[in-house]
């Protein structure tokens, strides 16, 4: 377990700031409308998954939350706190799995990819249904049918985005790292 993933070291603070900015940019320019109101196909969640896997739950939460707040303010002039927290907790839950994987040491096996995708699908369902939908019903008096439709589509789209693009990004990242024990002194 990499205990540095829990700390707000200068490296993690930089990752938090840069990651939040990238979240806003990708969220702004790589968002495809789904046809369901206020629900888009968001490529940014593959980036969030990658950041959470590299830097852990603290940075994952921060990038998801801060990035989503800034994106909402930029796009709509207001924010929906329950959905912002949902994005943050998505990064947090994926980051928790990162504590069990040595991706910085070039390890991301097929088994780890499968577990990663199970984790992210479950995390997507939890955050979008519980925090997003239930939050909208409680805080904004939104109709259940509407918010559960949004949560279902969001879970499906974000889960697929992370499964395909997120897994590819993580495999490429792991492949760029020097594997532990691969360098030998001659």
Curated annotation (Swiss-Prot):
The chain crosses the membrane at residues 13-33, 46-66, 79-99, 114-134, 150-170. It is found in: Cell membrane. GO terms for cellular component: plasma membrane. Keywords: Cell membrane, Membrane, Transmembrane, Transmembrane helix. Belongs to the UPF0397 family. HAMAP family: UPF0397. This is UPF0397 protein Ldb1710. It comes from Lactobacillus delbrueckii subsp. bulgaricus (strain ATCC 11842 / DSM 20081 / BCRC 10696 / JCM 1002 / NBRC 13953 / NCIMB 11778 / NCTC 12712 / WDCM 00102 / Lb 14).
């Amino acid at each position: 377990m990499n205990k540095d993933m829990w700390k707000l070291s200068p490296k993690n603070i930089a990752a938090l700031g840069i990651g939040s900015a990238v979240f806003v940019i990708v969220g702004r320019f790589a968002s495809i409308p789904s046809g369901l109101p206020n629900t888009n196909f968001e490529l940014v969640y593959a980036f969030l998954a990658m950041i959470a896997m590299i830097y852990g739950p603290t940075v994952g939460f921060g990038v998801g939350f801060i990035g989503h707040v800034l994106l909402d303010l930029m796009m709509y002039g207001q924010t929906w706190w329950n959905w912002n927290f949902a994005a943050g907790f998505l990064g947090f839950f994926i980051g928790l799995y990162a504590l069990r994987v040595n991706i910085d040491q070039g390890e991301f096996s097929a088994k780890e990819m499968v577990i990663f995708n199970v984790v992210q699908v479950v995390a997507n369902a939890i955050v979008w249904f519980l925090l997003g939908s239930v939050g909208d019903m409680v805080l904004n008096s939104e109709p259940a049918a509407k918010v559960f439709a949004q949560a279902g589509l969001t879970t499906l789209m974000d889960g697929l985005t992370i499964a395909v693009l997120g897994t590819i990004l993580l495999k490429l990242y792991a492949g760029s790292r020097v594997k532990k024990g691969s360098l030998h002194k001659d």
